[in-house]
A protein has these predicted regions:
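Residues forming the flavin
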Residues: 1-72, 109-286
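Dinucleotide-binding Rossmann-like beta1-alpha1 core, especially the glycine-rich loop
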Residues: 53-105
Length: 286
């Protein structure tokens, strides 16, 4: 969110003075010691390179880009669905201009519709969407290209953590971890996953009313790629919804990473797992 906000501000008004604060490192310096093969287990880095830095928590993901309002957030609570889809297409155009693929998977193909009918026989409901798989390595390349595009147009301050935000003199005063203070007229906060708890405290300090989103508890299961090839070759990732018979609880499949790799994440000392999947066949698992 912060990167694309900076991109759009510079596109609309290149004369603006924009400073982007990032607690992690630049896109070229980010490196998880597990992924680099230096260690086997998470060593609790003070700032997790998988979660923080230019590109955020998604920088090393498998790079799925979904064209849908059926899942992926609650933007339609604030913007009409047609406008949301226009914005999704607009962001995709930015990505394509910086090297993203134009190949798209869809639930509208004959194969996908046959898959949806078969799923209904088991009371599984396939959500409708188009999806691009950018690939972990291509995702990184796109972000590097965007960084090269922006680095001389606005100011990035890496390894810079904010501690407090306060209203002051018609703007905002941001206090940094090293004690420095920055004043700005307008402030856009994009704390990402790793900064969610911190930002909750900031909002309370500013007297903002908060709402709780639902929390999904997920289990990552590693299987041979051939088990789900009949699905992933057609739609790449299927969002299948099922409601349990006794209590009506909703469960779903999500975050498929065909031929992928399970990776560790560290969110303020809490270890979780994610999945990476490369576009290059030579980098895939089985």
């Amino acid at each position: 969110a912060g990167i694309y906000a900076g991109y759009e501000l510079m596109r609309r008004n290149p004369e603006l003075k924009v400073v982007v604060l990032e607690q992690g490192r630049d896109i070229y310096s980010r490196s998880c010691p597990i992924v680099a093969g230096k260690v086997k287990d998470c060593i609790q880095c003070k700032v997790c390179d998988t979660m923080c830095g230019f590109g955020g928590a998604g920088a090393f993901s498998d790079g799925k880009f979904n064209f849908t309002t059926a899942f992926g957030g609650w933007l339609t609570d604030f913007i009409d669905p047609g406008t949301v889809m226009e914005l999704i297409e607009y962001v995709d155009a930015i990505n394509v201009a910086h090297g993203a693929t134009e190949e798209v998977y869809s639930t509208e193909t004959a194969e996908a519709k046959a898959l949806a009918r078969r799923a209904l026989g088991y009371d599984l409901h396939l959500l409708q969407a188009r999806c691009k798989h950018l690939g972990t390595e291509k995702n990184l390349m796109i972000l590097q290209n965007i960084y090269e595009d922006l680095k001389n147009k606005l100011e990035f301050r890496f390894n810079t953590s904010a501690t407090t935000i306060a209203q002051a003199d018609g703007g905002y005063l941001v206090t940094l971890k090293n004690g420095d203070e920055l004043f700005c007229k307008y402030l856009l906060a994009a704390p990402g996953r790793s900064g969610a708890e911190w930002f909750s405290d900031v909002c309370k300090g500013l007297g903002l009313h908060l709402l709780n989103n639902q929390v999904d508890v997920g289990v990552r299961v590693e299987l041979p790629a051939t088990v789900f090839e009949h699905i992933t070759n057609v739609v790449y990732e299927s969002k299948l919804i099922y409601r349990t018979k006794q209590y009506g609880d909703q469960v779903r499949t999500f975050c498929m990473n065909p031929y992928g790799h399970v990776v560790a994440e560290n969110v303020e000392g809490i270890n979780t797992v994610n999945g990476h999947s490369y576009a290059d066949p030579a980098l895939r698992s089985e």
